[in-house]
Amino acid sequence: MDIVDVLPLDAAGAVIVLWAVLGLLGLIMQRSPRLITNIIFPAGALVSLALAVTGLWALGEVASIAVLPLGLPDLPLHLRLDPLSAFFLILLGGASFGVSLFSAGYFRSMEGNTLGLLCLEYHLFLAGMALVLLADDAYMFMVAWETMALSSYFLVTTDHHVPDIRKAGYLYLLIAHVGAIAILLCFGVMQGGHGISAYTFDAMRAAHLTTFWASVAFLLALFGFGAKAGLLPMHVWLPEAHPAAPSPVSALMSGIMLKTAIYGILRITFDLLGAQQWWWGVLALALGLLTAVFGVMFAAVQGDMKRLLAYSSIENIGLLLVGIGLTIIFHVYGKDALAALSLTAALYHTLNHAFFKSLLFIGTGSILHATGERNMGRLGGLIHRMPWAAALMLVGVLSISGLPPFNGFVSEWLLLQAFLLSPGLPNSYINMLIPVAAALIALAAALAAYVMVKFYGIIFLGQPREQALEHAHDAGIWERIGLGWLALGCVALGLAPVFVIQQLDFVTQLLIGQGLGNSASGWLFLTPVDTERASYSPVFFLLAVLGVMLVTSLTVHRFYHGRLRRGPAWDCGFPAQTARMQDTAEGFGQPIRRIFEPFFKIESELPSAFDTQPRYHGRSDDRFWFALYLPIKQITEKLSSWVSLLQHGRIHLYLSYTFVTLVVLLAFV
């Protein structure tokens, strides 16, 4: 009997087919919603886990390539699985495993017809993202990209009967397709006019574009993928689409879909284009800094918990672009060790963000499911009614805040190390920019922790701000398992950075020919450059914290046992506290709103002097919307009104339009 070798690419292709089949089964079984939630979504989760295992399998392997007998006459579909694709498949499979398990419980209350269609869209969305990561020609890539975009649009507009949700979906689809046009133009530039067969990625690698055309391709890629990732100023769809979408969909979009754009930037910049220019890195670094600082500032003043997380995603995407920009700069100037360090930091943070942001988004789904409320100003005290959700979301909050020993600290620490270890470069302007960039990254990290204190404290601590919260219930069993898996991922990625970086070396070796091979001193200590400069051991840190807590507890019980008593604290005659006396989400963000006032468009309404029920109302709007997008909208409406003059209903004039067009084409074409 012949034994057929199964390649990782074969396994990844089988996963995509299984997701599509599960989606179709969900549509067929729409009259049995319990079967969809109890069988289809858990099965989809197992398929996700299989994809993550496939990615781990392929990470250290030689790239595998397949040509399918489908596509255009002279351009069959090409698939490729290399270490870069494998890394993002691990991210996709690992994060979607937890989200799919959570979805099995979250969507139980949805009606059968809607649930069946959502199940199809959900699994097509996953399949589309996987195909994006495996595509090895422009045609296959754009087909997968559009599959991902359209399926996510339909997921965002699940509750399409709500006008605001339809508007959010339209805005998302519009910006997604503007970005897709830029990506298509980028592929056209890299194809170099050599026929349809040159649209394969192998042909683009061998094209050797001039500096001018390579720069044009890079700018188009940065704009096109930046629109999907939420870079300034194409970020406006995120805070609209995420609140509109069901929470598991928000988790997939923020935790995974945004990373497909990062994948696209990495693939084109370091793989397809080959040599880079120093100013590409400066542009990416500056744009990333602006995106990170702007995103975290706006997150600080949000009252809607899902909008807050959406702006937080903008901040984290900015951090990723900062790492990519640093990598380009160091690589161009031959500082390959530091280029590997900054690229490793960016890749590590990409993986970390997939886990902790997915965890936080599905956690807000549990809160929304239990309370029916997204406004943090109406929540509070939920730690007593939702202890499981509170404990697991605390892991995500500590991770995104960059506190050791959780995963967010490792990637942010590596990024700061890349700044701190930066040598003198031949370009004096870059030498001046890097310290400023490091300071802004530190500011963004501090503000991110501030935002998460607000997020967790307002929602879970204190007293309930509404009477209805007394009846809130904790997450169900499927939801707890999904939350627990993602929380476990945050802890594991934080405690085992040496193992993670050893796997990331396969990716950095592919992209820049350099890894952090000597980044470990044993398996306990992470030393990015050498032990004399910086080292970090999350296990020792955790043991030290636990040791201090243990010694403190033993000391208290040894010397004060029997003399401790519990009682109300003396509060200087302060009366009984009510829920209205607590800090609000708006009040917590007030210092940021005032300090960075020029960045916001602030509108406020103050009560009159004789108002018997005075209330203060304020809002902080995005200046980009009013300065950029609103004028574009007004110009478009004006042009449309002029074009409408041609739509007068007179047939003979319509025929004359056709005749004039034909004459022009015959004359000039």
Give the predicted meaning of each segment:
Residues 1-14, 24-120, 193-208, 506, ...:
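Transmembrane helix-loop-helix hairpins at membrane boundaries of multipass inner-membrane proteins
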Residues 42-56, 176-187, 393-405, 483-505:
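Hydrophobic alpha-helical membrane-insertion segments
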Residues 22-23, 49, 95-96, 187-188, ...:
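Hydrophobic core segments of alpha-helical transmembrane domains in multi-pass membrane transport
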